[in-house]
Amino acid sequence: MTAPEGTLESFLEGDCSVSEPLAITVTALAFVAETLAGVISSGPLNGRLGEEVGANSDGDRQKKLDVVADELFAGALAPTPVRWYASEERPTAEMLNPEGTLALAIDPLDGSSNIDVNISIGTIFSVFEAKESGVESFLRPGREQIAAGYVVYGPQTVFILATRTTLAQFVLHRGHFFLVSDSLRIPDRTTEFAINASNYRHWSRPIRAFVDDCIAGDEGPWGENFNMRWVASLVAETHRILTRGGIFLYPADARRGYGQGRLRLVYECAPIAFIVERAGGKATDGIDRILDLTPSELHQRTPLVFGTAEKVSQVCAYHDLPESEVSPLFGTRGLFRA
């Protein structure tokens, strides 16, 4: 049966860079995304989706919809070419199809704290070629991914797919994801930054200095006024930056449990970095490229700074300075002012 023209299915059929196993896997992910979009759009009519039902192996509180989403994805992927399945909601990688050739890591429901307040939430996924064991399949640099993507469940349900050669955006309409763009690119200039400013006192001096220089506006080193954004949903932040530019910062800080950042490298940061680089942006841990980092454990955390390449490079420059040279007054001394 031929897929309807302009749909995700027809896109996968026509893209020679997408192997058959990957196409089958992405189609299964899209099927679950459509199902979840329906569940989410009905909100409390489907029960208390934001109710806490326990904690995952890493200590994060699980909401009912976290568990539902994880079970839906694992079930739909079981008959596909996915050999290894790694989820935020499960302690270890699990074998789905012994004959499979792919390994898929996933955050089934990103931003679940926003469920009850009707703010955009999403799904993030990463695909590797499978190795003999689950550990080998996922504890490798993100640059070895063959595909990554995310879904935003918001006013529109959007599916973003990145492969090694393509980056495409699809929107759900009447049971199908339709292609709306295959030329996404993060704008080269930005006047927006996203960070949770309530944690300012816990940040390192380079992060505080960068934010201070943004807040200084047209009196600071950038010579223009900035707006701050914060949604507490990584997919929502990513999609805004992919659409209109900006920089996102979730740094390490001095609080207990935040010394290595809070976001997970394997199934959050690496796939987002893969997408961002495909769109012409940059993604680092504040210093080093995310896609060059090799995780030592499945649920490893890392700081994350991504977005418009110029601004991400400037954050790295703040970290390169001697500690004595970094202060909230740094900008007025003119490293970036002509």
UniProtKB/Swiss-Prot annotation:
A GO cellular-component term linked to this record: cytosol
Sequence positions that bind Mg(2+) 2: D107, D110, E268
Keyword Translocase: no
Keywords: Calvin cycle, Carbohydrate metabolism, Cytoplasm, Hydrolase, Magnesium, Metal-binding
Binding-site residues, substrate: D110, G111, S112, S113, N196
UniProt pathway annotation: Carbohydrate biosynthesis; Calvin cycle
One term of GO molecular function: magnesium ion binding
Pfam family, one: FBPase_C
Cofactor entry: Mg(2+)
Keyword Magnesium on entry: yes
Catalytic reactions of this protein: beta-D-fructose 1,6-bisphosphate + H2O = beta-D-fructose 6-phosphate + phosphate
Cofactor note: Binds 2 magnesium ions per subunit.
Entry binding sites for Mg(2+) 1: E88, D107, L109
Enzyme Commission number(s) of this protein: 3.1.3.11
GO terms classed as biological process: fructose 1,6-bisphosphate metabolic process; fructose 6-phosphate metabolic process; fructose metabolic process; gluconeogenesis; reductive pentose-phosphate cycle; sucrose biosynthetic process
PROSITE patterns attached to this UniProt entry: FBPASE
Subunit (UniProt): Homotetramer.
HAMAP family to which the protein is assigned, alphabetical: FBPase_class1 (MF_01855)
Stated family: Belongs to the FBPase class 1 family.
Name of the protein this chain belongs to: Fructose-1,6-bisphosphatase class 1 1
UniProt organism field: Bradyrhizobium sp. (strain BTAi1 / ATCC BAA-1182)
Gene name linked to the record: fbp1
